Amino acid sequence: TSTKNIKATLEQIDKLAENGCEIVRVAVPDMETGKKLSELNRQSPVPLVADIHFDYRLALMALDAGFTALRINPGNILKKNEQDILDTKPIDVLAKQILACDASVRVGVNSGSVEKDLLDKYGHPSPEALVESALRHTAYLEERGVTQIKVSIKSSSVIDTIKANMLLSEKTDYPIHLGVTEAGTPI
């Protein structure tokens, strides 16, 4: 269900809550969806997590709508400028709002979003590249005072996902969200 369809989304959330679900993540793919988050959050029987991709302004909209948890993939939000220098404005603005709202953040890194310099260093989205990316992004948040962080590392390779999370657990005390990306059978 598209999150834009508030009625259908709330029906799904209600069914999940009736069956014991305690928290629901909803996709926030665009501004149109972002404009409906206040209504969705207000009517939801359980806390919601805003799943943000590509545009940090969607995360700001979610926080303004009362969401207290975000899932972001900084590799998709942070971009380099023409001089190949990282533009930190998105993370600066977002961190300030996260702190003001006392929100938590799940930093999600996956094999499709590993930064070019790490791909060059490791040759492919290896477990080491995934972990270095995740630690880089948690550091961006920590440097700005954000500490309510959990980390998710996923690869289309189950073995790489396991290796990356084992390596991550040796390097940080942040909670780890375990999951599989690109789940399901091929069509």
Language model regions located:
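Hydrophobic faces of well-ordered beta-strands that scaffold small-molecule active sites
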Residues: 1, 22-26, 46-52, 70-72, ...
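Catalytic alpha/beta core domains of metabolic enzymes, predominantly
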Residues: 113, 118-187
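Alpha-helix-loop-beta-strand connector modules within alpha/beta enzyme cores
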Residues: 31-52, 89-103, 164-178
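N-terminal active-site wall of soluble small-molecule enzyme domains
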Residues: 8-16, 24-65
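Active-site mouth loops of central-metabolism enzymes
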Residues: 1-8, 27-29, 46-54, 80-81, ...
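N-terminal small/glycine-rich loop or linker at the start of catalytic domains
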Residues: 1, 35-43, 103-123
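Hydrophobic or amphipathic alpha-helical targeting/insertion segments
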Residues: 46, 54-104
